[in-house]
Swiss-Prot record:
Species per Swiss-Prot/TrEMBL record: Arabidopsis thaliana (Mouse-ear cress)
Top-level taxon of the source organism: Eukaryota
Keyword annotations: ATP-binding, Coiled coil, Leucine-rich repeat, Nucleotide-binding, Plant defense, Repeat
GO molecular function, one term: ADP binding
Higher taxonomy: Eukaryota, Viridiplantae, Streptophyta, Embryophyta, Tracheophyta
The protein's name in its UniProt record: Putative disease resistance protein At1g63350
């Protein structure tokens, strides 16, 4: 009898069957799943893009993205990359399948791929089904670290608004605030930082870092990490490079604002783990610095200068600090307070320190004493040597090179608020050997301009351009006090650097120890006589210009063996120098311009080192005998001198083998004029040339012939001449010519030589009654054939009282730099060489000024577009520009003695 039994196989078989079905479905349904994955991913990306657009609108309203939205967006970004990888492998994987997907050439590989596609499809579907009722909320202020802030600086409100609006522009990723020390850069940066506590504007984090003078990358990394809540042993044990990479990857997922206060050199954002701000990531970096060079190196397109306060704003800040009790304690104190405030020159740091000191001074005498101290030696004023000057000295210390530092200190030799010509400064520096002039004057001057540029960009000098085109610099009064303080060894050796300029001195001041004096400036005083002997064994510079000097004793210069620079210019009653000047064996610079000097001093030939001699505007000079003995002379300036040139003078000057720069005024009718103009040696040196005829005598020759060697000529003036032609050499070039002035040249008919002056910036032509063409077409044939386009750098064109002038040029010119055309008294000038594209465009675009409305209405324009451009705003500027034109005529008349 057998035993029978049964095993329940059905459940097991079902499970195995389901498992096999699922495995097979990964490959069997692969193509269908891939299509679904691609479609669903496209829908997810569209949903993501819609959400991002909504978020942009919300962020612009000052709202902040919710955390769950950020998480969802990060997941979409991650899964998009993985889906792309799967879809990129699609063709290869489908080719492996056979038997309608029930089998594969590589079953394991196809199974894994099919499973990945299936699972990724489920993830994408889940993300795509997500619905968000709310995507943003009011921005949290917890990520903004408010900085302690002194009361807002009076007058900086507009600057704050401008800075904020500029920073919020989409195209601005990095903004630099620059300016001199103590001007309020950090205060302004703090105000911008604290403004984010009210308006986050969609930023996730606002980070503030103070950068030390010596950049420490690791310290900055740690500080930024702390601000974004990265800390712990894992961070601390990372190397500097690892910290940078980690922080970079962390910050690139955020929208941040980074404030870097007080940087002195370029900060490499990559090194400190900061992604560079772009339009795409919408991050911002804002920094303060004293150097414009730093702004440039950081990639700032439009640096914002933080300037000193205007007078009214400065006084408002000053009186607010002093307080009404003190100001009201005596009626005179309020008036004196304006004088004291003005001494601070709008510098907030100085205004704060000085006002705090004066807030308890309630007698008129105390205020008068304060003014005296600030005028005589401000470093002694309370708070100056410990709160103001040391802070400014950081800028001085950061200058690269002792020569640059010395050049800054030299600027302090001039009076307060002095406008200093750049060329004068550079000449002093060369002759003091601060700048090496051994390789030529041009190279030394270029170095001088580079130094001035570096001082301007370091916010230590201020740059201006005068109406006559002169380039000048100014020294802020507080910076000047700092320079004097440094030059006197921080106040320990006041007699080493004596500056008593423009203080009303009537005699040489008393000095305890003349042997320590290195530089002395007594310019612009009332010292009629220099008597006795000064034992100044270390003196290298002595500036005595414009001191009403009449006489110098014979022994005055006997003990100045190191004197290199002596400026006696502007002393109109000084008619001779003592023979003792021969004792100045180290003298390299002697300026006798605008003096009453009649002849060169007898001892001049002993000055073997003299390289600069200035005799400009010497109306009494009758002899230059002996000048050929100055074998090392490189620069001789005679412009405006009434000295009558002759053949002997030409020969003497030609004997100066080292001469590089010459400026002069010559009479059109003197015997030596033609010889001078034909001297290739002298013409190769000429930098300024003025030809005039004030005697009304007729010249033997009717033309002036210019040689081909005038490549140094920068300014050319012709006055009251009977010349009918300015003739050029065949291959003539005036490559350095910047300014040309012609007046009362009544026989001149054209100025075609100007075609060969590619760098000409200013052209004034006045009262030349027979002038018909500026550039004559027939005579310009060779230049036109060579492809020369005239006036590529012309900035100003002034044409006055030219009755016969018909043409400037016969066809439209680009004039890419032209800003002004002033026309008056030119009735026959019926067409201007302009088209609608000519001249500068934009804010400083070309304008045409005139006095006669009848003339401008008769002008024949190139086309309607040209007419529209230059006449569109005529009514808005004609009356004011008529006045401006009159001013120019007045200036020109003074210049040309009309």
């Amino acid at each position: 009898m057998g035993i029978s039994f049964s095993i329940p196989f059905d459940p097991c078989v079902n499970k195995v069957s389901q498992w096999l079905d699922m495995k097979v479905s990964y490959t069997h349904n692969l193509e269908k799943n891939l299509v679904a994955l691609e479609t669903t991913m496209e829908e997810l990306k569209a949903k993501r893009d819609d959400l991002l657009r909504k978020l942009k609108r919300e962020e612009d309203r000052g709202l902040q993205t919710l955390g769950e939205i950020k998480v969802w967006l990060n997941r979409v970004e991650t899964i998009e990359s993985r889906v792309n990888d799967l879809l990129n492998a699609r063709n290869a994987e489908l080719q492996r399948l056979c038997l309608c997907g029930f089998c594969s050439k590589s079953l394991t590989t196809s199974y894994r791929y099919g499973k990945s596609v299936f699972l990724k499809l489920r993830e994408v579907e889940k993300l795509e089904r997500r619905v968000f009722e709310v995507i943003s909320d009011q921005a949290s202020t917890s990520e903004v670290e408010e900085q302690q802030l002194q009361p807002t600086i009076v007058g900086q409100e507009t600057m704050l608004d401008n800075a904020w609006n500029h920073l919020m522009e989409d195209g601005v990723g990095i903004m630099g605030l620059y300016g001199m020390g103590g001007v309020g850069k950090t205060t302004l940066l703090t105000q911008i930082n604290n403004k984010f506590s009210k308006y986050m504007c969609g930023f996730d984090s606002v980070i503030w870092v103070v950068v030390s003078k010596e950049v420490n990358v690791e310290n900055i990394l740690d500080e930024i990490a702390q601000k974004v809540h990265i800390s712990g042993e894992k961070w601390d044990t990372k190397y500097k490079y690892q910290k940078g990479v980690y922080l970079y990857n962390f910050l690139r997922k955020m929208r941040f604002v980074l404030f870097l206060d007080d940087i002195w050199e370029k900060v490499n954002l990559v090194e400190i783990g900061v992604p560079f701000p772009t339009i795409k990531n919408k991050c911002k970096v804002v920094f303060t610095t004293r150097s414009l060079d730093v702004c440039t190196s950081m990639g700032v397109e439009k640096p914002m200068e933080v300037q000193c306060l205007a007078d009214n704003d400065a006084y408002d800040l000053f009186q607010k600090k002093v307080g009404q009790i003190t100001l009201g304690s005596d009626p005179e104190i309020r008036e004196l307070s304006r004088v004291v405030a003005k001494k601070c020159c709008g510098l907030p740091l100085a205004l704060n320190v000085v006002s705090e000191t004066m807030s308890c001074k309630r007698t008129v005498q105390e205020w008068r004493h304060a003014i005296y101290v600030l005028n005589s030696y401000a470093a002694k004023f309370s708070g100056m040597d410990d709160k103001i000057l040391p802070l400014l000295k950081y800028s001085y210390d950061s200058l690269k090179g002792e020569d640059v530092k010395m050049c800054l200190l030299y600027c302090a030799l001039f009076p307060e608020d002095a406008k200093i010509r750049k060329e004068n400064l550079i000449e002093y520096w060369i002759c003091e050997e601060i700048i090496d002039g051994s390789e030529g004057i041009d190279k030394a001057e270029n170095q001088g301009y580079e130094i001035i540029g570096s001082l301007v960009r370091a916010s230590l000098l201020m740059e201006e351009v005068e109406l006559d085109g002169a380039n000048i610099v100014c020294l802020h009064d507080v910076v000047r006090e700092m320079a004097l303080w440094i030059a006197s060894d921080l106040g320990k050796q006041n007699e080493a650097f004596i500056v008593r300029a423009s203080v009303g001195l009537r005699e040489i001041l008393k000095v305890e120890n003349w042997n320590v004096v290195r530089r002395m400036s007594l310019m612009k005083n009332n010292i009629a006589h220099l008597d006795g002997r000064l034992d100044c064994m270390e003196l290298t510079t002595l500036l005595l210009q414009s001191t009403h000097l009449e006489k110098i004793s014979s022994e005055f210069f006997n003990s100045m063996p190191k004197l290199a620079v002596l400026d006696l210019s502007g002393n109109y009653y000084l008619s001779e120098l003592p023979n003792g000047i021969s004792e100045l064996v180290s003298l390299q610079y002697l300026n006798l311009s605008s003096t009453g000097i009649r002849h060169l001093p007898k001892g001049l030939q002993e000055l073997k080192k003299l390289i600069h001699l200035y005799l400009e505007r010497t109306s009494q000079l009758g002899s230059m005998v002996g000048i050929s003995c100055l074998h090392n002379l490189k620069v001789l300036k005679l412009s405006g001198s009434s000295y009558a040139w002759d053949l002997d003078t030409v020969k003497e000057l030609e004997a100066l083998e080292h001469l590089e720069v010459l400026t002069t005024t010559i009479d059109d009718c003197t015997l030596g004029t033609d010889q001078f103009l034909s001297s290739h040696r002298l013409m190769s040196c000429i930098r300024f040339l003025k030809i005039s005829n004030n005697s009304n005598r007729n010249r033997n020759s009717s033309r002036i012939s210019l040689p081909v060697t005038m490549d140094r000529l920068q300014e050319f003036t012709i006055e009251h001449c009977h010349t009918s032609e300015i003739k050029m050499g065949r291959i003539c070039s005036f490559s350095s010519l910047i300014e040309v002035n012609l007046s009362n040249c009544r026989r001149l008919r054209e100025l075609t030589f100007l075609m060969f002056a590619p760098n000409l910036k200013r052209l004034h032509v006045v009262s030349s009654n027979q002038l018909e063409d500026i550039i004559n077409k027939e005579k310009a044939h060779d230049g036109e054939k060579s492809g020369i386009v005239p006036f590529p750098k012309l900035n100003e064109l002034h044409l006055y009282n030219l009755r016969e002038l018909k043409n400037i040029y016969w066809s439209p010119l680009p004039f890419p730099c032209l800003e002004k055309i002033n026309v008056m008294g030119c009735p026959n000038l019926k067409k201007l060489p302009l088209d609608s594209k000519s001249g500068k465009h934009g804010g400083n675009g070309l304008i045409i000024t005139h006095r006669e409305m009848e003339w401008i209405t008769r002008v024949e324009w190139e086309d309607e577009a040209t007419k529209t451009r230059f006449l569109a705003n005529r009514s808005s500027f004609s009356s004011s520009l008529i006045c401006f034109s009159n001013d120019l005529v007045s200036r020109d008349m003074n210049c040309f003695h009309l």
